[in-house]
Design a protein with these regions (language model features):
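Glycine- and acidic-residue-enriched helix-capping/strand-helix junction motifs
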Residues: 16-30
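Glycine-centered flexibility sites
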Residues: 9-12, 16, 90, 150, ...
């Protein structure tokens, strides 16, 4: 059983970056919830923990404490970006510039590639995989990747984020990357269909009356003439 912390950045009294009609905290949360739902619907063998699943403020130390208490295998920090220059745009991911868990850089590479497969079709920039001294990548007791999906302060990037279904797609791409990293087993979907025979009647009229009653309950039906030997 693999343990994953999906952390939507900012929240509540801390909206994060604001621009072009978007609050970063809202965008982060939507992507995080989509990632959670995708992993739960598509994969087994994991436990998911979210420091926040609604618009509330959760401090960085509280997020670290949660990660410690659940002994997480992976911490993914979901963020969007901002710049004083509104021309700044694109997708980038970060790990810490100092000592790392042995697997962290490979995890970053996989997550970055999976999300870029979506964003490369949108005409934005690939700013690459980077290392820096962010608090979250420095202090989490698990391999940590900081996602900076797009710049809310850039009009073109903001327009991408506003596209119908885009935040869901980004969450699902992130979830697919996580599944690859941790080699999560896909859920087996049973596609078999079952037929229920409701009864056998001597009269065709009675059979059709019973069929209509089933239709009224929302069931599909068929009447079959069964020849007796």
């Amino acid at each position: 059983m693999r343990t994953i912390v999906l952390s939507a950045g900012h929240g509540g009294s801390d909206p994060g970056a604001v621009g072009n009609g978007l609050r970063e905290s809202d965008v982060n949360l939507a992507i995080t919830l989509a990632c959670r739902d995708y992993l739960n619907d598509s994969y087994s063998g994991h436990r998911l923990f979210l420091p926040r699943d609604k618009d509330v403020y959760v401090s960085l130390p509280a997020r670290r404490n949660l990660t410690t208490s659940v002994n997480a295998d992976l911490y993914v920090s979901m963020h969007n970006n901002a710049a004083s220059n509104p021309a700044g745009r694109g997708f980038e991911t970060f790990t810490h510039s100092g000592p790392l868990f042995a697997s962290t850089l490979e995890y970053q590479k996989i997550l970055h590639a999976q999300v870029w497969r979506v964003l490369m079709q949108q005409g934005t920039l690939n700013r690459g995989t980077k290392r820096a001294n962010h608090w979250v990548t420095r202090n989490m007791p698990a391999p940590t990747v900081l996602m900076e999906y797009l710049f809310v302060t850039n009009a073109a990037d903001a327009a991408i984020l506003k596209k119908p279904g885009m935040l869901k797609t980004l969450g699902e791409a992130t979830g697919e990357g996580i599944a690859k990293i941790l080699k999560l087993p896909a859920k087996v979907v049973d596609t078999r269909r079952w037929i229920v025979i409701a009864g056998e009647y001597e009269s065709e009229q009675i059979a059709r009356e019973k069929a209509y009653a089933l239709k009224g309950l929302g069931f599909h039906y068929a009447t079959v003439d069964v020849k007796k030997n």
